[in-house]
Amino acid sequence: MDFQNSLCFMHDPDVSKRAFAFDMYGTLVRARFGNLNDIYEAFYRLFPDADPEEVQREYERFTDFHTSAYGPHKELSISVLLEHMDSVFHTDNDSLEAENIMMRATHTFIPVEGAEDTLQYFRDHGYRIGVLSNTAYRGSVVKGLLEDVGFDHLIDVVVSSADVGYRKPHDEAYSAVVDALGVHRQDCFFAGDTEEKDFLGPRRFGMRGSFLIDPSRPDRECGIVSSIANIPTFFRDRI
């Protein structure tokens, strides 16, 4: 490997300062979503006595209101949505159970090639590993699906925008995963497949480094890679 023209990082000699956060969708897993009918049916079943069309109208009204009132980076979590819908339709759903039902009814996760080996590399080098995802589902729900695909022993924390209330690239999202990992921002790396949210945002926030997965324009000097499997090649134990 020619490191002369490549971005290169040394593993911090203090293992307590080693942390790496990853985006989820498109980075660690590909999500196969159910069709819209499956999604709506899973949602309608939570309000068995209501007319599905009324449920749909209220859902659209509330989500439109939330976006116009709070802007695109403020997350509307499933738990907040369910709390509102319960109040309108006089139901009493267990929001965590309902989230699990909805997510498992509408999502199938497929590991990205090279993701497990990359996570294992950083785990073997003493890194604490986190996931930060823009999703309306709580991190505890998402973590269950990541465990199902075999990542349970490789991930320490899962933080979602539903937990934080803000979506990437808002600083609150990055701050939440850094805090959950128990490190300072300058000790944490980030990787993902979206330039603004996963590459530029973490750098502006002050993370130690970030990597963009984009097969169309790999550039080792900038930390842009064609595959998640390339990321460990930027790290060395010593000069």
Show the residue positions of the predicted features.
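N-terminal helical cap/lid subdomain that shapes the substrate entry/recognition surface
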Residues: F3-Y121, H125, G139, R238
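Asp-based, Mg2+/Mn2+-dependent phosphohydrolase catalytic module
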Residues: M1-F22, R30-F33, F47-E53, E116, ...
